[in-house]
Amino acid sequence: MPLLDSFKVDHTKMPAPAVRLAKVMKTPKGDDISVFDLRFCIPNKDIMSEKGTHTLEHLFAGFMRDHLNSNSVEIIDISPMGCRTGFYMSLIGTPDEKSVAKAWEEAMKDVLSVSDQSKIPELNIYQCGTCAMHSLDEAKQIAQKVLNLGISIMNNKELKLENA
């Protein structure tokens, strides 16, 4: 089985919060599809709470679209990593990492401004597979931690695993 791109980087060297351009590929029509690693926690040192991660999943994608989508960039999806240390963001176009970091920072401020749990999008039995597993307070704690620590840019060359 071929090694996935996400396993070709040394997770012991990853800073967090940090942005990494993980992959760029071309569609058959020549458009760039980019995948960003938005690392909220240092791998194997910290983890996002289950409920906080789920609530962020509902809030983060919309807020990131508000701050990053443009004539040359369109977010396809933002999904939490199974390890709960971050999210992957797939998009059409390839914004620079500083723009992604700025949009992420603004999105975290937006999370902090959500007034109560009833304002979480798609939080109902029809649109969410586990609608009882949410915590706006935990999502806000995650967002505040990102803002307190600041978002850095990861260097793929420094993270590359030998023989990967």
From Swiss-Prot:
Cofactor binding, note field: Binds 1 Fe cation per subunit.
MF-aspect GO terms: iron ion binding; S-ribosylhomocysteine lyase activity
Subunit (UniProt): Homodimer.
Chemical reaction(s) catalysed: S-(5-deoxy-D-ribos-5-yl)-L-homocysteine = (S)-4,5-dihydroxypentane-2,3-dione + L-homocysteine
Family designation: Belongs to the LuxS family.
Cysteines paired by S-S bonds: none
Cofactor(s) recorded in Swiss-Prot or TrEMBL: Fe cation
One Pfam family here: LuxS
Residues in the signal sequence: none
Keyword Lyase listed: yes
Gene3D superfamilies according to UniProt: S-ribosylhomocysteinase (LuxS)
Protein name stated in the entry: S-ribosylhomocysteine lyase
UniProt organism field: Campylobacter jejuni subsp. jejuni serotype O:6 (strain 81116 / NCTC 11828)
